[in-house]
Structures are given as C-alpha cells and as structure tokens.
Regions:
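Beta-propeller domains with acidic blade repeats across secreted/periplasmic ectodomains
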Residues: 19-458, 477-480, 842, 918, ...
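C-terminal capping alpha-helices of c-type cytochrome domains
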Residues: 38, 120-121, 412, 504, ...
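Inter-heme linker and motif-flanking segments adjacent to c-type heme-binding CXXCH motifs
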Residues: 155, 421-422, 529-533, 540-541, ...
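Short flexible coil/turn linkers enriched for glycine and charged/polar residues
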Residues: 264, 498, 513, 745, ...
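Sequence context surrounding c-type heme c attachment/ligation sites in exported
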Residues: 408, 415, 821-835, 842-866, ...
C-alpha cells in the first residue's frame, strides 16, 4: 500500500526530531562568509530547481515522483496528484524560512527540472512541455495554465528540458539535454528539429536520430541552448551538441555560461558559450557517439568534446568526473568586491559549488581558476564515482546541490537534493529530504528590498536587483515608458557596478530613437565590453545591422570583431562578404574563438572564398608548406575541397612539424570528395610513419560515415586492411585509458574488460603484462574475461601471465569435432536449451542472433568454439541490436553510428561492421542477456556434437 503524503510528513517530522543532531549542516566556505540552513523538509521535498520572486520568496520545483519506473513509489514519498511547485518565505526576517505553500500540484508535473518566476507568469520546464502558469490575481494560485512550447524529448529523464531565465535583452533563455528528438514549433510556426544517436535512460526514450534540419537550414544536435521572445515567437538556437547541460545562465553582458556532464569519465566541464557554438559531444551530425570518433593518442577529455575537430568550440575548464547542475552569476555587491562577477556552478556529485572569475581573453573568455567555494568536504575528488556506495556512506557526502541562485537580498541560495547517490535515475533517500542554504557575509545583515514597480525610481531599483528574473520586471516596466526614461536609464552608465552599466545599455536600445541613438554612441566607448554589449543590443533592434557591422569590422579589439563575425552568420552572404574578408584578414592565427566565429560565418561559402583567402595571406604565390599560421589554421577550419592538394602537400612536407602535418591530414579528413579518399590513400604510403598511420586510421574511420559512397572499399580494404586498422586504433584508445592515472578504477575496468574480450586487445594486454605496465589491480578483471577471448592464441598464452578461474567441465573442441552428431537429437536439444533466445527459421526467439544462416558463417570447429566459450565476445553494460540483411546475415552487437547511408555495429568481439542501410531487412534492439556455458546446462560432448550437426546440416 502506498503511504499517504500527510502520514509521510508526520513520520518525517518524528524522524527529524529524533535524528536532527545526526544531520551535518556544516559547510566549508571562505572565512568572510557564513552559511545558515534557510529551509528544510517538510517545508518542501526533493528540490530540483529554484527561483526568486520580487518579494524575495524562493520558489521550488519538487521531484518527489522521481523516476517511478526505477524507484518503487510504494517505498518512497509520493504525491498522487503530481509533483508540486512550492513557495517559501522568511516572514520575520530572521534569516530562515518559516512559511511554505503549495502553488500548484499537477499530474503534468513529473520531476520538473526548471522554474522561472517572471511577474505573474511562472514558467515550469517538464518535458515534453514548457508550461506557463499565470497567477492573475496574485493569490499564489494559478488562474490559468498554458503549454508555452511542446515537443521536447526526454520525458521523465534528467537529459531533458531545463530551466528558463530572462536575459538582459528582454528575451527568455533556456536549455535542454540530449534526450531527443526535440521537434518544437514556436508560435510563429518556426520549427526546431534536433536529435542524435542517443536513446535510453528511461522507458520512454526509445527513438532518436541525428542529421535533421531545422527551418533555418542548419543541423542542430544533442543538447541545446535556446532563446525565445516572451510571446513565444523567434525561437533561436544559441548553442548545441551538449550532453546534458543542466542550466545555461545568461549574465548582464549577454554572455552565456554553461556546465556539462560527462559519460561517466573525467570529462565534466564549465565554459563560456559563444553564440551558435558547437559544444562537441556527438559528431557534427549527431549520428555518432564521441567514443566512435576517439582517435589514437587522444585523451578522454579531448575526444569527449571533439576538441581536435574543426567547427567545435573550446571546452573550457575540465572539472573531472561529476554531476554538474545549476548555475548563477553573482552580479551583486552585497557579498563584497571579491565575489562580484563570480560564476557559480553547482556540482551535485562532488558535493561542492565551484566558482570562477572569468576575464576577457583575446576574442573570448578565460573562465579562470576553479575554486571550491562551498563544500561539505574538506577535499575534492575529481575521480568521484556516482554509484560508489562505500564512498558515499558518510552523510557529509549527501550534500547534493541541485541549484544555486542569487536572492533579491544579494545572498547566495543553494538547493540541496540530499541523497547518498546522484545519477542513473536513482535515489536512496526514501523520505525526500531537502534543504536550502543561505550564504551571506559575516557580520552583515542582508535584507530583501521592497520593490515598487509603480514608480520610475522603483523600476530602476528593480533593474539593479541581483535576482535575474526580478530585474527583468524592472526592465519591462521601464521599456514600456519609452524614451521619457532614457535619462534615468543613462544615469546607470555611471554606476560603479559594471553589470548595472550593461543592463542600461540593453535597455537604452529599446527606448525609442533617443535611446537607440545613445546606444550607437556607445559603439565608440573606450571599454571593449561596453562596445560589444552595445553591438549585441543593436543587433536586436536594428532592421539593418550591416552598416554598423562594417564600422566595427576595424575595431581594435578582436573581442568586438568576433561579435561582428558571429552576427554575419545570420546575414545575407552577398551583402556581408567584404566585411567577412576584412575580419578574416585580421585573424592572428592563434585565437580559437575568433577562428570558430569566422568559420561559422563562412559556412556554405568556403569553396568560393578559398582563392581570395589565399590571396589575403599571400598563399597564392607560395608553396603550401610556406603558408603562414593564419592561412593554415583557416584552411584547417574551412577545409574546402579546393585545398586538398595543398593540404596533402603540407601533410608530407619534411619542413613542417608533426603537429602542423597532423593538422593538414585532419583537415583533409574533413573534406568529402573522391579526391579526398585518393589523397588519404597516398598518405598511407608516405615516408613519415606517424602520418601514414594517421591516414590509415582516417580511411578505416571515414569508410563508415562521410566517405561511405566515395570509394570501392572492398578494394581499398584489401590493400590497407582497414578492419584491422580500425580495431587496432580502438584498442590503442582503450590501452591509453588504462594507463591514464587520472581515470577511475571503474573506467579502467570497463576498458580492460573490452580489451580482454577482443583478439587484438587481448594481445595488447599480454604485452602490457610482459612489460609490467598493466596495473596490478586489474589482474583479477582480466582473469575473469581473457580465457574466453575469441583468439585461441590469446587464450593459450594467457595462462602464462594470468590465473585461470575455476570452471566446470572442460570441453575439447578437437575431440568433440570427431564425434558423429545426430541432427534429430540436435533439433530437440536446440528447442530445449537454445530456442528461448535464438531463432532458426520459424522456431525460437529473437533475443540472441538468428541462427538460420549460421552454417554460412561458421565452420564446425568455429561454431563449437562459439558455443563452448559463449562469453568470448559479450560486452557488459550496453544494449545490443540484431541486424538482419537481405542476404540472410545476422549481426548482433552495439549501434555506434546511425547514418542515412550506413550504420555501424560493434559486435560482441568489439569488431565494427559497416552495413549499408539499403541492405537491411530488420533491426531490433535486444535486451542484455548472457548465454550460459554448456556445462551449466548439463550438456555433454555428444549433445554439443548433435547441436552443431543440426545447425550445419539444416537446409
């Protein structure tokens, strides 16, 4: 029987009164700050996100009904009428909440992940909907409910629709994770189509796909940062290809800041997000996971975020393993000068609030040194493992900050999910306990101001407020007054707080012709950031921004010029080409942000621009090996087909460094013509062994995706042995992970298991053991797997280096092969022991591979080997697929790429098979299963001979 909520609260209060002293409220934080427990359950439960209203109250989204498909609601607190939105308030000003009320309890709310309180409209993010509740009469109850947007993927999933905030431009910003597809149409009819190869995580996330075009003609993939007008029109992608950025935060300059979590490796990050930036989690079209694209020699962080690929933005600060959540930018003076401008990033896995002090660098931002601003632990662990119960046993590790925000009083508020684990759609805290901490300066009493929106002075005060969605209300009220408040707003340009100045710039551009004229004057301001904000603001109000872009194309700051390049991406190329060439000419050859901005502006026009770009840098009169850094870098980014011969020449030049030659080979790999393939084949024959090996890798890799239709791969493969090259590259990557001291034990374990199951990987492990380079703690892991390696030579050699675990009866393939089998007995034995997983013609199930045509794939001894050593190729932890072709072949394995022309299956031995989609009859996703060893089924030598005879003699 499910426990009623009211009874649960009674039990909760009793338990809390008995065990209050056992809950650790202590936090480690700077000496000049102090933390107080502002609120805790039962005022609310399981907080996922929060916001602040104009009264200084905290609004909370609860996720009590959290993943009921994974967490039995009978044993956890459950709200039968749906999850709730709660309002918390400190009515007596003593620094602790004393009142809570339910704003809404709604069955449409299933673990909502975001809330924005914007006046009397409360936006709630809960895939597939972005909902808006309107409290028209101010009684803290919704009078209406509207689906503001719908079509987001990720129902009841962490990688889904996240929170919304109001930007300084008057628009709304929000983001979503990679649990697509996201098929969203705004109120003007513009449609976003975004997806990727990622499925799973919940029972609802079953279908997804990459390489979809939105109405702007662009391919957006994975997680997204989005902007929309308050009326629901003007949906625009601000960044894409995230894994699962939990919250994208916009500051008063219009900068976007985001954190993103990893694929259970040490690759979480925090970064500045340039408009339109590609964060690099999937391949550019979303049809491949990062693991499929990892190259030999790349570390996990580089590969995880595709850092060596043209078209991908810099990844920012590598924070290690973890579960990053909410973000905030402190624009308040209340905490003191040291904290002004601090970017705060909540890290639920690591029990910490990270902080940064970003500064402009070149044309972008250096996010600065990461510090552990607030934590429940004295020391941080970058190799944290989310489901390590032993490590999470101590309740000081149950501090799980799900969100961080700045209140109207200037204090930092931290929502604490509070649970032994975070991740994997799990929770272990059955009572739904949650907390909110308030961080303030010592010896300073911060008070929430009374904001009067009926007067200009009150509206200015609201605009200055540190609570992001509160200042939006001041913005809107002042904007409605038009140019008559221009002078009042201009007074903020003299503020000692730079964020107040920036807010004034944005608002001025909206205050009629007078305000716009004053904003244009700011394009000549001595401060680079003010000039850039003025340009950003004018982009949104000027019908024709090209004349202003032309003026700023000679700005002394690369930061401003990069803003201009960013704007050109959305403008008619025929009108902006001269500006674009001027911007390209000023590229310094080093600045990656600038390079990516001009690369995006050149999108679709690289071939046309190639001759003129060469001329700009003198490349038209030089040999390719003489190209300067600027030209070489730009051609790496643009990789036009016209540059193939030059790129090939640079890749083999003895006058260039390995780094320069590698860059040219990489650029060549991102062109897609038959000439590209031929050039890469030629590189496999060059005298530089490093480049030759890279070229072999690129051919093996590109065969399955961009170059699939550009060559007769059977001929190329026979000449170069592409399959071996591909597998060798994969095993090299895994070996690098095992030898990387930064990786967690679990990460090494998964990779060493994969190597031990693979013929090439097994040989590598034996060599590593011989060299004493294999970590000793991995010996038991290898021993449990390697004796089932598909390569007989590996299995035989393994006994010289590893201890073979005890097993049942030992079968001899050679001896069984000599036994005369009976097909009729084999038929009976198959029905009894095998048909529950395997199908032969119309007999059996489709859980394992279809064995109808198995005799065409295996000789007798090979088939015996597969039956006797059933675990030889099963990769643990992934969902398998069964692919059937028109020829009758069956491929059982794991889908790593899903393109329009071909798919790639990694089979149970780790081999990758490229299959043309036109030859596929069916593709079925399989449940994880393990085929039992013959001895566990009580099978004898004669039984095995009978089964093999039946399978090989079947017509």
């Amino acid at each position: 029987m499910r426990i009623p909520s009211f009874l649960f609260v009674t039990v909760f209060i009793f338990l809390m009164s008995c065990h209050q002293k056992k809950i650790n409220h202590d936090l480690f934080l700077p000496d000049d700050l102090e933390a107080t427990l502002w609120a805790q359950s039962p005022l609310f439960y399981n907080p996922t996100n929060m916001d602040v209203d104009i009264k200084g109250r905290i609004w909370i989204t609860e996720a009590v009904n959290y993943r009921n498909f994974n967490n039995d609601s009978i044993h956890f607190l459950h709200h039968q009428n749906g999850d709730r939105i709660m309002i918390l308030q400190d009515t007596d000003g003593d620094g602790e909440a004393d009142v809570s009320k339910v704003f809404v309890e709604d069955k449409d709310l299933v673990s909502p992940l975001g809330i924005a309180v914007i006046g009397n409209k409360i936006f709630v993010s809960c895939s597939p909907h972005l909902l808006v509740y309107t409290d028209a009469d101010g009684d803290d109850k919704p009078d209406s409910k509207e689906i503001f947007l719908t079509g987001f993927g990720g129902r009841d999933h962490d990688h889904s629709l996240h929170s919304m905030v109001a930007g300084p431009d008057g628009n709304l910003y929000f983001n979503t994770g990679n649990a697509g597809p996201h098929l969203v149409t705004d109120k003007a009819g513009w449609t976003l189509r975004s997806g990727s190869v990622y499925t799973g995580g919940t029972p609802y996330n079953l279908t997804n796909q990459g390489n979809m075009k939105s109405d702007d003609g662009r391919v957006w993939v994975g997680g997204l940062a989005l902007r929309i007008n308050p009326d629901g029109t003007g949906l625009k992608v601000m960044g894409h290809n995230f894994r699962n950025s939990y919250e994208v935060m916009v500051d008063s300059y219009g900068n976007l800041w985001q954190n993103d979590n990893d694929d259970q490796v040490v690759a979480c990050r925090t970064s500045w997000l340039m408009e339109g930036g590609n964060a690099g989690f999937f391949s550019n079209d979303g049809t491949r996971f990062w693991q499929a694209d990892q190259r030999p020699g790349q570390d996990i962080f580089e590969a995880h975020w595709h850092q060596d690929n043209p078209g991908v933005m810099p990844a920012g600060d590598q924070t290690g393993a973890g579960s990053p959540t909410g973000m905030a930018v402190n624009e308040s003076d209340a905490l003191g000068e040291d904290y002004l401008g601090m970017v705060l990033s909540a890290e639920a896995g690591r029990n910490v609030i990270f902080s940064y002090k970003p500064k402009p660098k070149d044309s972008g931002y250096d996010i600065g040194k990461r510090t552990n601003l607030i934590s429940s632990l004295p020391q941080d662990n970058e190799r944290y493992v989310w489901n390590d119960s032993a490590q999470n046993a101590s309740n000081n590790k149950w501090f799980r900050p799900s969100d961080v925000t700045i209140g109207t009083d200037g204090a930092i508020y931290i929502a604490d999910w509070h649970d032994p684990v975070v991740g994997g759609h799990q929770m272990q805290d059955s009572i739904g306990y949650g907390r909110i901490y308030r961080i303030t300066p010592k010896n300073k009493n911060l008070k929430a101001p009374h904001l009067d929106l009926t007067s200009t002075a009150g509206q200015i005060e609201a605009l200055e407020n540190p609570a992001i969605n509160v200042r939006y209300q001041g913005y809107e009220k002042l904007k409605a007054q038009g140019d008559r408040v221009a002078d009042d707003v201009m007074s903020l340009l003299k503020s000692s707080n730079p964020y107040h100045q920036a807010r004034a710039v944005w608002l001025l551009s909206q205050l009629g012709e007078k305000g716009k004229t004053e904003t244009e004057k700011l394009l000549q301001h001595t401060d680079t950031i003010i000039r850039s904000v003025a340009f950003r603001a004018l982009r949104q109000v000027e019908k024709d921004i090209i004349p202003i872009a032309e003026k700023l194309s000679d700005d002394p700051s690369s930061f401003v010029r990069r803003e201009v390049a960013t704007a050109l991406r959305d403008l008619p190329y025929e009108k902006t080409k001269p500006i674009l060439l001027k911007l390209i000419k000023q590229y310094d050859g080093q600045d990656r942000w600038y390079l990516e901005a001009i690369g995006a502006a050149c999108d679709g026009h690289a071939e046309e621009l190639y001759p003129e770009i060469k001329t700009l840098f003198g490349g038209d009169t030089q040999k390719p090996e003489e190209w300067n850094t600027q030209l070489a870098s730009i051609l790496w980014r643009l990789h036009p087909a016209a540059a193939i011969s030059g790129l090939k020449a640079r890749a083999v030049s003895s006058k260039l460094s390995t780094k320069e030659k590698t860059a040219s080979a990489t650029a060549l790999a991102f062109t897609s013509t038959k000439e590209s393939v031929h050039a890469m084949i030629d590189l496999t024959k060059c005298n530089d062994s490093i480049i030759a090996e890279q070229a072999s890798y690129w051919l093996a890799f590109r065969q399955s995706n961009d170059w699939f239709n550009l060559a007769d791969w059977s001929k190329v493969g026979n000449a170069i042995n592409l399959e071996h090259t591909r597998m060798l590259s994969t095993m090299k990557v895994k070996r690098g992970i095992i030898l990387d001291k930064r990786q967690s034990f679990n990460e090494k374990k998964w990779n060493v298991q994969a190597m031990a199951k693979n013929a090439i990987g097994g040989q590598m492990l034996l060599s590593m053991r011989e060299e004493n380079s294999l970590p000793s703690e991995l010996y038991p892991v290898v021993e449990n797997v390697i004796f089932n390696n598909p390569d007989l030579g590996v299995r035989v050699q393994a006994s010289n280096y590893f201890k073979k675990p005890g097993s049942g009866k030992t079968f001899s393939i050679t001896e069984i092969a000599k036994i005369k089998g009976k097909a009729t007995s084999g038929d009976t034995l198959f029905s009894k022991n095998c048909s529950s997983c395997h199908r032969v013609k119309n007999k059996g199930m489709d859980i394992g591979p279809d064995l109808t045509g198995i005799k065409n794939k295996f000789e007798q001894e090979a088939l015996l080997d597969a039956i006797i050593h059933p675990n030889a190729g099963i990769v643990f932890g992934y969902e398998a697929w069964l692919i059937t072709t028109k020829r009758g072949d069956s491929f059982f394995g794991f889908l790593v790429a899903d393109g329009a022309q071909a798919i790639v299956i990694k089979d149970l031995d780790g081999a990758r098979h490229t299959i043309a989609t036109s030859t596929i009859v069916s593709r079925k996703k399989q449940s994880n299963s393990l085929m039992p060893e013959p001895s566990s089924l009580g099978l004898t030598d004669q039984n095995l001979a009978d089964i093999v005879t039946y399978l090989t003699m079947m017509k």
